[in-house]
């Protein structure tokens, strides 16, 4: 029995060593410039050698010259995060303050100048569209979800069946299928927007997307703008913001006042009713209430299989999390129907670029004082680092400072 016990202990120790080595190996991969995770990622145009990058002294050099010149350090090729931050991202520790590498990258871009890289955008858009089929599958429609179709939930195993009720609630076709907007503004709700003066820049876009029924009121006009073409909502927002269930008359009055005060009377409302079981009937009630009471808003239901494809696409690119936030998900979708994507108010940290405290929401929502970092369904820190990579590569514009 003694030998058996010793043998068992030896096996356990061996397993622990192997697991630890495996963890160290994965972390080394994450920090290596040869892997597209949280370290340096090659440009989509690296094969052509035609992209200009910024050298350490600010001059522009061809990417092939940079690759062949070990003495040239490309500012845009700096790692987005360092090894210690990679370990946090890989584990359960949240990155709650902007790492120095992020701050340096953002400062370099601001100091040296930045433009959209249209060639890189086209390549990336093609890859993303081929993997996710956004134009066909982003919105649940009567074309892609006929009666009796069996469709999988996006955030859990299992499927649901398209009933007559669901079919009647679907749009015949997606209003975004054949549209390409020159510029889109995606506006998060970070306290970073307070005092930013970004309202005019946001409103310049051809298509403006906002999240979770924000307060788009005159008080915030200079910082967040006034226009909204699509706004997301979830079940919690629908109930808590208006203090009643959607079918109640007080809710109808409160919602009508809200959309009028926020200039949302004709805005498309985007919902995700089929992420998990149990939400479908609630959102159908919501949609039917709007229709019965004469609201002009069209409700667009997300196709859950599209969201799952988007999650799988980013997982292959190193972004693993239980569920992407609606913000990151909509950025991914917008890359298919917007030529240029500009992102405002996305900031997962407790301090800004100059170390000042930042509220989670510009409206000082005291229900979310932690910056959302304790929501274990999302890893908004991981998402932000991926957005920073896209910004560095000229694929999206990530606005993290004032616009004045």
PLM features per residue range, with description:
Residues 2-404:
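Metal-ion/cofactor- or nucleotide/acyl-coenzyme-handling active-site neighborhoods
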């Amino acid at each position: 029995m003694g030998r058996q016990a010793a043998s068992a202990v030896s096996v356990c120790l061996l397993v622990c060593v192997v697991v630890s080595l495996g963890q160290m190996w994965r972390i080394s991969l994450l920090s290596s410039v040869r892997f597209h995770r949280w370290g340096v990622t090659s440009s989509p145009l690296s094969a052509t050698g035609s992209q200009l990058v910024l050298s350490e002294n600010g001059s522009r050099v061809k990417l092939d010259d940079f690759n062949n010149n070990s003495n040239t350090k490309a500012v845009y090729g700096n790692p987005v995060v360092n090894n210690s931050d990679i370990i946090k991202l890989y584990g359960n520790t949240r990155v709650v303050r902007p790492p120095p590498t992020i701050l340096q990258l953002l400062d370099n871009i601001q100091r040296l100048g930045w433009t959209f890289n249209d060639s890189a955008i086209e390549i990336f858009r093609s890859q993303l569209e081929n993997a996710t089929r956004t134009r066909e599958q982003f919105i649940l429609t009567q074309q892609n979800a006929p009666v009796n179709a069996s469709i999988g939930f996006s955030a859990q195993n299992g499927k649901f069946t398209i009933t007559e009720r669901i079919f009647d609630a679907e749009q015949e076709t997606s209003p975004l299928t054949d549209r390409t907007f020159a510029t889109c503004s995606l506006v998060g709700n970070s306290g970073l927007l307070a005092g930013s003066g970004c309202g005019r820049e946001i409103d310049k876009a051809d298509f403006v997307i906002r999240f979770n029924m924000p307060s788009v009121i005159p008080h915030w006009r200079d910082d967040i703008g006034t226009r909204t073409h699509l706004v997301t909502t979830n079940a919690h927002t629908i109930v808590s913001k208006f203090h009643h269930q959607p079918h109640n008359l007080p809710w109808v009055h409160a919602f009508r006042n809200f959309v009028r005060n926020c200039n949302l009377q004709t805005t498309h409302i985007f919902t995700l009713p089929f992420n998990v079981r149990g939400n479908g009937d609630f959102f159908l009630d919501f949609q039917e209430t709007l229709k019965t009471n004469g609201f002009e808003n069209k409700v667009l239901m997300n196709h859950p299989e599209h969201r799952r494809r988007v999650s799988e696409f980013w997982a292959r690119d190193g972004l693993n999390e239980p569920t992407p936030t609606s913000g990151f998900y909509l950025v991914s979708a917008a890359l298919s129907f917007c030529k240029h994507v500009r992102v405002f108010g996305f900031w997962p940290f407790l301090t800004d670029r100059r170390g000042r405290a930042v509220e989670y929401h510009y409206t000082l929502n005291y229900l979310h004082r932690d910056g959302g970092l304790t929501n274990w369904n999302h890893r908004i820190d991981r998402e932000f680092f991926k957005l920073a990579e896209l910004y560095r590569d000229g694929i999206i514009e990530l606005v993290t400072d004032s616009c004045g």
